[in-house]
Amino acid sequence: MNKKLLWLGSGLALTSLSAYAQKSHDVKPNIIYIMCDDMGYGDLGCYGQSYISTPNIDNMAKEGMRFTQAYSGSPVSAPSRASFMTGQHTGHCEVRGNKEYWRDAPIVMYGNNKEYSVVGQHPYDPEHIIIPEIMKDNGYTTGMFGKWAGGYEGSVSTPDKRGIDEFYGFICQFQAHLYYPNFLNRYSKSMGDTAVVRV
């Protein structure tokens, strides 16, 4: 008899905990993930740096969460972002360098573009789900600002095709390396864009 009551009590407790957990999960947290090229672990005040003031990011870290055991997937930008987006180790991810795709010549040496009809990097494999798609599937509105480098214009992997609602930045990261970029890209669901456009 006592065993039955114990199991019944455990079942009620688990049901209550489950209902409480469900209630607390109804409100999704806002997620802002900041990834920067060439930034070291100790370059922000929230990680102990005291020479340069970084109050806004420090405040975000204080109100949110900090990664204290996160490491870059690669020492260069496109593969590092690809490692984060796909959840794959750099050795398993197709994006392994900052190769540029340009027009009909698949790979262009860095900086040799004379005109910019189609530019970008190696596309993420459309068979692999990436972070923005996971977020969309879980009811989030998604935005990305800065370097995409997960495909070239018109490829199978541009922000509009990979779960991003609002994008403003560079499809081709080469443009981000110029003091005066030739163009920026935008995809805005709220503005009625149906594909990535140049602005």
Predicted region positions:
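Formylglycine-dependent sulfatase
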Residues: 2, 8-13, 20-199
